[in-house]
Amino acid sequence: MKNYTGPIFIIIAATLWAFDGLIRQHLYTLPPITIIFFEHLFGLIILFPFIYKYLLGTRLTKREWWLVILISILSGLFGTLWFTTALGKVHFISISVVFLLQKLQPIFAITSARIFLKEKMDGRYVKWAVLALGAAFFVTFKNGYVNFATGEGTIIAALYALGAAFAWGTSTTFSKMLLGKVDAKVSTFYRFLVTVIITIPILFLFGYGASLSTPTISQFGFLALIAVSTGMLALLIYYKGLAKTSVHVSTILELTFPFIAIILDMVINNTVLSLSQWIASFALVYSIYKIVKLREEVALL
């Protein structure tokens, strides 16, 4: 059984992440920036008692602080903002599609790593990246047909989802630069802290200050649930599983995440993908798997 504990932990983490979109649906009356503020604030409060000793022993350099700020802006602010906004446009795009488009993150991660870290890029990468992007189009638009009655709304919703994939994928590169110097728990805490600090002036500058007092008790409960379950808890379970699982196996297991989200969307929201979207989904996930494998092969050279 010990041989299976790692993969089981990764699948549990993937399942928790899949629930994230469904939980956020209950917060549709709140501005996305307000959701970001509270989920990071709650995460910060919950995380602090467990890592304050690590914080006392850590001193960040000027370069490391800039990396934390950059990661917070990309991942904490824009990534979460665009993802939450995309989920709010359920009249144009299903939750399943939003989650599937997140699998494009490795394309942005590898491209940014090539630019900023000068990592090698295999020539075969372009072929699989083009396939992934083509599949993403058919995932977004059923049968490849753009309904011009709702086409603009669908495109905007898809662009928000792609924007989230870009922000999170690119921040992976900067996180890699930071994690080489700073403990993961400490960098996560500072990312949450900086995100909270950044969102405060944005809330008031754009007239959302009053929304801080509008969440209901149940919405506060959902915000806390996001911070604990699909946020930190999922991440801790994932890292525990990753420590006991080879990279090759974990890469495959992580690809179960969008399909778990699709199943949950079908069961809870009665959303069913068309045959063309299912085919495109498998093509998208397989091409991303090949891209990740190519990156592993290049890293070993």
Q: What is each PLM-predicted segment?
A:
Residues 1-11, 106-166, 281-301:
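Juxtamembrane helix-loop boundary signature in multi-pass membrane transporters
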